[in-house]
Curated annotation (Swiss-Prot):
<feature type="transmembrane region" description="Helical">
    <location>
        <begin position="135"/>
        <end position="157"/>
    </location>
</feature>
<feature type="domain" description="PAS">
    <location>
        <begin position="255"/>
        <end position="319"/>
    </location>
</feature>
<dbReference type="InterPro" id="IPR005330">
    <property type="entry name" value="MHYT_dom"/>
</dbReference>
<dbReference type="InterPro" id="IPR000160">
    <property type="entry name" value="GGDEF_dom"/>
</dbReference>
<feature type="domain" description="MHYT">
    <location>
        <begin position="7"/>
        <end position="201"/>
    </location>
</feature>
<feature type="transmembrane region" description="Helical">
    <location>
        <begin position="103"/>
        <end position="125"/>
    </location>
</feature>
<feature type="transmembrane region" description="Helical">
    <location>
        <begin position="5"/>
        <end position="27"/>
    </location>
</feature>
<dbReference type="InterPro" id="IPR035965">
    <property type="entry name" value="PAS-like_dom_sf"/>
</dbReference>
<feature type="domain" description="EAL">
    <location>
        <begin position="545"/>
        <end position="798"/>
    </location>
</feature>
<dbReference type="Pfam" id="PF00990">
    <property type="entry name" value="GGDEF"/>
</dbReference>
<dbReference type="GO" id="GO:0005886">
    <property type="term" value="C:plasma membrane"/>
</dbReference>
<dbReference type="InterPro" id="IPR029787">
    <property type="entry name" value="Nucleotide_cyclase"/>
</dbReference>
<keyword id="KW-1003">Cell membrane</keyword>
<dbReference type="InterPro" id="IPR035919">
    <property type="entry name" value="EAL_sf"/>
</dbReference>
<feature type="transmembrane region" description="Helical">
    <location>
        <begin position="44"/>
        <end position="66"/>
    </location>
</feature>
<dbReference type="InterPro" id="IPR043128">
    <property type="entry name" value="Rev_trsase/Diguanyl_cyclase"/>
</dbReference>
<keyword id="KW-1133">Transmembrane helix</keyword>
Amino acid sequence: MEIHVTYNTTLICLSILIACTASYISLELSRKVTINTGLKSKIWLIGGSLIMGFGIWSMHFVGMMAVHMEMPMEYEFMPLMAAIGASVSGSFVSLYFVSRHILTYYRLLTGSVVLGASIASMHYIGMSAISRVMIIYEPILFTVSIIIAIAASFVSLKIFFDLAVKKHSEHLIFYKGVSSIVMGIGISGMHYTGMLAATFHKDMAPPGSHMEVQTFHWSIFVTLIIFCIQTLLLFSSHADRKFIKQSERIKDNEQRFQSLIVHNIDAIFILSLEGDIISSNHAGEEMISKFGFSMHDWRNYTSLKVKRLFEQVKKDKQAMNSDSDLITEKGQFHLNITLIPVEVNQELDSIYVICKDMTKQYKAEKEIHRMAHYDSLTDLPNRRHAISHLTKVLNREHSLHYNTVVFFLDLNRFKVINDALGHNVGDQLLQFAAKRLSSVVPDNGFIARLGGDEFIIILTDANTGTGEADVLARKIIQKFKKPFKIQDHTLVTSVSIGIAISPKDGTDGLELMKKADMAMYAAKERNKSKYRYYSFSIGNKETVKLNQEMVLREAIENDRFVLHYQPQFSVKKQKMTGAEALIRLVTPDGQLRPPGEFIGVAEETGLIIDIGKWIIDEACKQARIWHDKGYDLSVAINISARQFQSKDLIPLIKDTLNKYQLPPQLLEVEVTESMTMDNLNHSKKVLSSLTELGIRISIDDFGTGHSSLSYLKDFPIHRLKIDKSFIDDIQTHPKSEQITGAIIAMGHQLSLQVIAEGVENAAQKQLLFEKGCDHLQGFFFSRPIPPEQFEQFIIEQPSQ
């Protein structure tokens, strides 16, 4: 006989709620199983299976209680237990698959079938527990319920796995909530589909002898207990998750701290309060090994300074830093040490020591200091060091009333030797000279190289009354009388010395050095192996030079130079063939100053280079103007000694010729004998280069310098210029006449043209004509005149 059944809507909703809650707890349990490892993971797997299984079964049990029949419902005990076992088994399968970390499609499908079968078994075994009722199932709905069970299992396993491996985020709780609703509805759907498939009939068979569960209230109590357990588990899981996160943060911080120590490039030691090393990082172990002792010997090698610092940190409980030296069998090390107190529960526990080996940096700083204060070539103090030392000495002298003597020294002929034999020989000469100077400097003396071939000696606490400065100056001069043997060369040089004394000559270091420098130049002018004291006259002379230099600089900036031209005549052709360009300085008031008044200062200060460039450019420009007007006159220019030694001379002349498109034969270069003799190889190279350009070369002031037949033979020279001093005396001194004749004859023998300068009267002209001189120049023909007057002079010449 069929039994009519009804359903309690409240209990149905309660069962669905229990299903959703069980699903949510299952998701939590799946994460527990996944994030834990080892024994802890196994405990969560077993315990979680029981909790999850009972939760799913409770949904089924409440759903069963939602069914109302015409007769009281009683349940057999053993089928109920079997249903619980099926639910727990299915839960175990689902959690086990999730814990595998990799969920393949085959594993997902297999797990879904097993879990679905377990849930279906739980349901239908639980249905069979109803006493004195025969249940007949409609096949299609029965099959649909099993399919729903498998599909719900498939979705559940997929959701379990995805959320179990998903990293925590602010959206994770929302995902789990939605997923638990989907899973709960799926499980409930399977249950109630199975209920729809069932028709209940009274079983007329007598009741069995097995145990039955009859108490409805006891069932409600069990269900509520399970629901409470689920709720408690839910809150416990949430609290556990917060605890785990906090533990992870603490663990992460601890790992970061340990990583900071372990991977720190600086040595870190943890010291006990007694000063023993408890532990260290790898860098600390390497440092101890480099020092050559063990960690147990640390206290034996610790300096007194560090020990005091250690005690101070213990006392004040504040970090401190200091530099310290450590001396071991492996050598001396320079360390920077930071001591940091470590407190636990407001009690000093240990001391952290951060130790940096600054040995290389210390040596580098020391080397930098040496490079900044010492000369790399001679190992003597340099200019900076000398100025600093002199300043300190003068400050002390001012309070103690001592005398300080400053010697300014310059090697004579050094530039000639350096240019002729090369920088290697020049450097060695400076090194040997430095050693000789150092050997005579007394204990109260200080020596430094200022640069180039200049040195300075400073005598402190000097007794000027006993002639201490004179004695030292003479010793230095005597030392340099002995030649230097360098490589295969025997080199002779001397030294010029200038002396200034404080406080007589000043109390400022730079002022004393400047005055000693002035005195040195005065000594060099008088005799290149002398010494001179600074005096007012020397200072006044230098002041005049300084004023002249300022005038020259102002003239260069404002283009206040002009060239005047003095005609040169051919004796044979009886006509003008060229001119010599002679520079004049135009003063602000319009007066002209001849070169003799400023060329010396220009040469000494180096301004002659700029002036020489202007002369070359202006002379070439004027020669081109005359050439365009049909006046084929060569223009002779004088080259200074400093410009002759310059590497820029040849390119400058070449560029200027190209600039004005001037035929090179219209330019003549005059050089003196002395400048060509300073460096024969360089001179030959320069003169040959000029000749290759097509420029004619004249030797100016011939007969007054280092006259040598060898250089007349070797150098590409075109003309000799007899010095004016011979022409002045040619009428009154027979020897001057004979020398003049000899120069002319020698020049002709060497196929050289000869020109005489300074011809001032007809008698001199006639005498030179008789001796066969080729060209004449002097006031007899014309003074040096501006270009405009020179052109008029050309026009007035009948031969032109």
